[in-house]
């Protein structure tokens, strides 16, 4: 079980995973892991689960077996989980790991372009729409963005289109807390994403 620490995080698959007689191993960096795995490797102080996987591979003595493709996957996970190394990334060991991944022949600049600079036109227009309706609460150093089911339909929303939206308000000077409310397109529920910086 990678990068999730509670069965409820995997929605419909939770019952299947819970009922599976297979041995379960959790590798994760989120706080308060649930006790549903035989082995739990949980380190919230680590920046990403991908970094944790890399450390585990090296601890077991298999660094030489990491392929270029494997190194690309690890780097991509580290990069996306830290917002392009803009938060939770002050540990100097992260950059030692990156240098080790570079030794496998990865092109980190190309990976960045493919992850962050290949969006569809509709996603970009959706982002503009969401930001144009953003509400900033200056007295609280906070911002709120939202997206209804109807609005998603208007912009031909596909799963993942709003990934990272919650981080954008944090680029506003003095905004330390961001909340993103998105109406689910399949279930009668609203998904809430929260982000903060500093000591908010």
Locate each region found by the language model.
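Short beta-strand segments
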Residues: 1-3, 28, 77, 145-148, ...
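Active-site cofactor/cluster-binding pocket
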Residues: 1-39
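Fold-independent oxyanion-binding glycine-rich loops
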Residues: 2-5, 27-30, 56, 82, ...
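Short, glycine/charged-enriched secondary-structure capping and boundary segments
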Residues: 13-17, 39-42, 92-93, 194-195
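Solvent-exposed alpha-helices and their adjacent loops that cap or buttress functional pockets
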Residues: 16-19, 33-34, 66-68, 77, ...
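Hydrophobic/aromatic beta-strand patches that form the interior of the parallel beta-sheet core
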Residues: 23-27, 39-42, 143, 179-181
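Short alpha-helices
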Residues: 29-97
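Hydrophobic helix-and-loop "lid/oligomerization" segment in the mid-to-C-terminal part
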Residues: 82-200
